[in-house]
């Protein structure tokens, strides 16, 4: 097999600054995501002093805050954590779609990695599973993705 130069990110958060956006809506789930992200970054050498938690009402507000945080130059990465649980109306679809598109747009336009930890589930049980039980913790996964992406981008 041909050997290729490979660029990979190291999981070392030392010296990096993170903005963690967390929604208040469904906070009983979101708080578990935040705990997972903070714990993960700390285990990777990050300092709690280099993490800023920003609380917002809901997922729809996340992109505008992420945009301002990314543009500030104060953060190496933004981690967006929230939970949108399907209800009886189409509101879920509008919020989930626009928040998702907006967060992706922020990352592309700013060049600052944005971790997508917005749960979009059909039931409360599914959200709980993804916030630290059977489905792992998506807050950890979002933090890990941001950390690895930061370290890869440093090498490009």
Swiss-Prot record:
Residues given in the record as 5-amino-6-(D-ribitylamino)uracil binding sites: 25, 59-61, 83-85, 116
EC number(s) on file: 2.5.1.78
UniProt keyword terms in alphabetical order: Riboflavin biosynthesis, Transferase
SUPFAM superfamilies the record matches: Lumazine synthase (SSF52121)
Any single biological process term in GO: riboflavin biosynthetic process
Any one GO molecular function term: 6,7-dimethyl-8-ribityllumazine synthase activity
Gene3D superfamilies: Lumazine/riboflavin synthase
Active site residues according to the UniProt entry: 91 (proton donor)
Catalysis performed (reactions): (2S)-2-hydroxy-3-oxobutyl phosphate + 5-amino-6-(D-ribitylamino)uracil = 6,7-dimethyl-8-(1-D-ribityl)lumazine + phosphate + 2 H2O + H(+)
PANTHER family: 6,7-DIMETHYL-8-RIBITYLLUMAZINE SYNTHASE, 6,7-DIMETHYL-8-RIBITYLLUMAZINE SYNTHASE DMRL SYNTHASE LUMAZINE SYNTHASE
Family: Belongs to the DMRL synthase family.
Pathway the protein contributes to: Cofactor biosynthesis; riboflavin biosynthesis; riboflavin from 2-hydroxy-3-oxobutyl phosphate and 5-amino-6-(D-ribitylamino)uracil: step 1/2
Lineage: superkingdom: Bacteria
Name of the protein described by the UniProt record: 6,7-dimethyl-8-ribityllumazine synthase
Residues bound to (2S)-2-hydroxy-3-oxobutyl phosphate: 88-89, 130
């Amino acid at each position: 097999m041909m050997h290729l130069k490979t660029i990979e990110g190291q999981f070392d958060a030392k010296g990096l600054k993170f903005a963690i956006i967390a929604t208040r809506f469904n906070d009983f789930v979101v708080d578990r995501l935040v705990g997972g992200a903070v714990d993960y970054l700390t285990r990777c050498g990050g300092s709690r002093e280099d993490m800023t938690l920003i609380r917002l009402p809901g997922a729809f507000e996340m992109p505008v805050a992420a945009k301002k945080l990314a543009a500030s130059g104060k953060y190496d990465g933004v981690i967006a954590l929230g939970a949108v649980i399907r209800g009886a109306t189409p509101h879920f679809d509008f919020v989930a779609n626009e928040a998702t598109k907006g967060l992706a747009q922020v990352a592309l336009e700013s060049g600052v990695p944005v971790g997508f930890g917005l749960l979009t589930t059909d039931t409360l049980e599914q959200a709980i599973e993804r916030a630290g039980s059977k489905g792992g913790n998506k807050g950890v996964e979002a933090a890990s993705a941001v950390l690895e992406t930061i370290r890869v981008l440093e090498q490009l």
